[in-house]
Amino acid sequence: MAWQMTQLLLLALVAAAWGAQAPRTPRARTDLLNVCMDAKHHKAEPGPEDSLHEQCSPWRKNACCSVNTSIEAHKDISYLYRFNWDHCGKMEPACKRHFIQDTCLYECSPNLGPWIREVNQRWRKERVLGVPLCKEDCQSWWEDCRTSYTCKSNWHKGWNWTSGYNQCPVKAACHRFDFYFPTPAALCNEIWSHSYKVSNYSRGSGRCIQMWFDPFQGNPNEEVARFYAENPTSGSTPQGI
């Protein structure tokens, strides 16, 4: 009896050691739908948020963001990321609305599962990579921002944060957006380290993520997420970072 207990104990120890060493497995395809990423302000699970603020309101029936997060998404230098949109003078309102909508999509959407990837970052454990943004949404973003000013083409890193919010690094000159982003694809693909990849598909195709949609017509991104979850080799679900 004693030797049997010893064997069982050894097996348990080996199993525990193996489990501790085993890497976290990628999300199963069934886990790619209706999910929130493990990031700084996201809820653990999506659900109704009836009072989401202004541009974030399309996600009120099913959201990964809280009401407070949606309010902060509309503020300059908000507590979310202390990001200053006006780092090269005042950003045009028509341009800023795209960045607010971009923030709402990132914080609130439960339909980004096929593009969620693990990262080893202090402020988040997951990010999105290569989200296929509808070409019209990318085009209008670029058109409305091309006459605003910035000093960098990658806004994820390289800022001067000594003041508590982002400022242009030394020797980084302010130029119009179309200097740093000469094409719509340059803007959408590069500004957030390839979080987006501008799609050849159009809005309503069921093959690209819409940053803007009419909630009274339903959320078109649900169909898009389902398609890429079921077709992981379709070309818009990158396999690594």
Curated annotation (Swiss-Prot):
InterPro entries to which the protein is assigned, alphabetical: Folate_rcpt, Folate_rcpt-like
PANTHER family: FOLATE RECEPTOR (PTHR10517), FOLATE RECEPTOR ALPHA (PTHR10517:SF15)
GO cellular component labels: apical plasma membrane; basolateral plasma membrane; clathrin-coated vesicle; endosome; external side of plasma membrane; extracellular region
Residues carrying covalently attached carbohydrate according to the record: N68, N160
Protein name: Folate receptor alpha
Subcellular localization: Cell membrane; Apical cell membrane; Basolateral cell membrane; Secreted
Propeptide feature: residues: 235-241
Native organism: Bos taurus
